[in-house]
Amino acid sequence: MPTINQLVRKGRKSRTSKSDAPALNFGYNSMKKKATDNPAPQKRGVATRVGTMTPKKPNSALRKYARVRLSNLIEVTAYIPGIGHNLQEHSVVLIRGGRVKDLPGVRYHVIRGALDTAGVDGRMQSRSKYGTKRPKK
């Protein structure tokens, strides 16, 4: 525990909070080949690998994921939500932050219905989250 004198001299340091989606905090200047400070809510990227992985201990499934090289040249793993998808290698996708609790290392979500990613077919509820258009009457 610090003395009063130490607190007067140094003071308390406030904790710096870490970002949940660090890859969205950088841009890239291709002329200077340098990362720039350009935070964004979403980023575009190209899928370099699409596959399935198994979740952590109490759960059992084959969760779909895509390895994505973003426009700022950072490569991340993103979860593909919903039933069925049309992604393959070299598909252009839009990602947002948001981790998947039972998949280690997956801190991003692919946005359905944007760029090359199709919305979920036959989805009636929560359509906006899965990029599905309103069904015709």
Curated annotation (Swiss-Prot):
Tell me which InterPro entries the record gives: NA-bd_OB-fold (IPR012340), Ribosomal_uS12 (IPR006032), Ribosomal_uS12_bac (IPR005679)
- Please verify whether the record's keywords include Ribonucleoprotein: yes
Name the coiled-coil region(s). none
The keyword rRNA-binding belongs to this UniProt entry's keyword annotation: yes
Domain of life of the organism encoding this protein:
Bacteria
Task: Point out residues bearing the modification 3-methylthioaspartic acid.
Answer: 102
What is a single Pfam family found in this protein's UniProt entry? Answer: Ribosom_S12_S23
Keyword terms? Methylation, Ribonucleoprotein, Ribosomal protein, RNA-binding, rRNA-binding, tRNA-binding
Annotated region described as Disordered, given as residue ranges? 1-44
* GO MF, one annotated term: structural constituent of ribosome
GO CC, one annotated term: small ribosomal subunit
GO BP terms, alphabetized: translation
What is its quaternary makeup? Part of the 30S ribosomal subunit. Contacts proteins S8 and S17. May interact with IF1 in the 30S initiation complex.
The text of the family note is:
Belongs to the universal ribosomal protein uS12 family.
Functionally, this protein is described as follows: With S4 and S5 plays an important role in translational accuracy.
Q: What is this protein called?
A: Small ribosomal subunit protein uS12
